Regions:
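Short beta-strand to alpha-helix junction loop
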Residues: 54-62, 87-109
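Conserved SAM/SAH-binding loop
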Residues: 11, 52, 121-125, 139-141
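N-terminal FAD cofactor-binding segment of flavoenzymes
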Residues: 19, 39-82
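Active-site substrate-recognition segment that forms the wall
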Residues: 183-226
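Beta1/beta-strand and adjacent pyrophosphate-binding region of the FAD-binding site
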Residues: 1-12
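Central helical "cap/lid" subdomain
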Residues: 35, 143-195
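Glycine-rich FAD pyrophosphate-binding loop
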Residues: 7, 19-43
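A conserved short coil-to-beta-strand element within the FAD-binding core of flavoproteins
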Residues: 120-134
Length: 226
C-alpha cells in the first residue's frame, strides 16, 4: 500500500484525502488541531467564527452538504440578510450552513471521520528525496519514507518548502488584500434588524451576529471584517 504524507489539515487537505482511495495516509499539522483557517475563537463564554462564517447552500460541491450532515458537522439556519446595508438594500431571509459547535466543527468532524494518524504541532521545515522516496523534517524529527507528499498550504509556505523541487521563477505570485477581523461582544442585545450583511460602511465589508448561531450566551457577539 502506498504511503502518503499530507502536509496541512485545512479543508483542501481534508477534501483531498476524503476523495483518495484507501491508502496509508499520515497528516502533518503545525497547529495543535485540524482546520487551518476555518477556526472558531473562544473567549470566556463567547464564541466567534473566525476565518469563515458559513457555507452557502448552493456552493456547487456535489454531495458535500449531505456528507457534512451525515457526520453531524453542520446545521442549517435561516437568518435576516442585507446585501448592502449602507445603501439600505432590502432585508431578506437567507438560509446558510453553519457548524454544529462553531465553524470549526466542519474540519474537526471531517478529520475525525477520516481516521488517519496526525502529527500535530509538527511544522515541516524540509522535504528530502532519496531513491524516489520522500522524507519530512521538523526541527528535531524526521518522518518517512513516503511514496507521495501532498502539500496543502498557502503559496508562500509551499514556495519555501518546495523550491528545490519546483522552479518558481516562472510562476506568478498571488497578490492578496488584507482583511482585518474584529471580534466584539456587547453586554446587551442591540436589536439589529439583520443577522448578517455586507457594506455597513466604506471600511466594514461584512459583519455577522454570532448569537443566532450560538444561542447559549446572553450577551451579543459580532464578527466584523474590514
Amino acid at each position: 500500500m502506498k504511503k502518503i504524507a499530507v502536509i496541512g489539515t485545512g479543508l483542501s487537505a481534508l477534501s483531498l484525502v476524503h476523495h483518495l482511495p484507501a491508502l496509508d495516509v499520515t497528516f502533518f499539522e503545525k497547529s495543535w488541531r485540524p482546520g487551518g483557517r476555518i477556526t472558531t475563537r473562544r473567549h470566556e463564554n463567547y464564541i466567534f467564527d473566525h476565518g469563515a462564517h458559513y457555507l452557502k447552500q448552493d456552493h456547487g460541491v456535489i454531495g458535500l452538504n449531505e456528507f457534512l450532515d451525515k457526520i453531524n458537522a453542520t446545521k442549517t439556519l435561516k437568518g435576516d440578510f442585507c446585501s448592502n446595508i449602507q445603501n439600505q438594500s432590502p432585508i431578506e431571509e437567507k438560509q446558510v450552513i453553519v457548524g454544529q459547535k462553531g465553524i470549526e466543527s466542519i474540519p474537526l468532524e471531517l478529520h475525525k471521520s477520516l481516521g488517519y494518524p496526525t502529527n500535530f504541532s509538527s511544522k515541516i521545515k524540509k522535504l528530502k528525496n532519496h531513491k524516489q522516496e520522500y522524507y519530512l523534517e521538523t526541527d528535531n524529527e524526521e518522518f518517512g519514507p513516503f511514496d507521495f507528499v501532498f502539500c496543502c498550504m498557502p503559496f508562500e509556505q509551499a514556495e519555501n518548502l518546495l523550491n528545490s523541487f519546483i522552479d518558481y521563477n516562472n510562476i506568478s505570485k498571488p497578490v492578496f488584500d488584507v482583511i482585518w477581523t474584529i471580534m466584539i461582544a456587547f453586554n446587551k442585545r442591540l436589536g439589529s434588524p439583520f443577522q448578517f450583511g455586507y457594506h455597513l460602511s466604506p471600511n466594514i465589508s461584512f459583519l455577522m451576529n454570532q448569537n443566532f448561531k450560538h444561542e447559549f450566551f446572553s450577551d451579543e457577539c459580532w464578527v466584523i471584517n474590514m
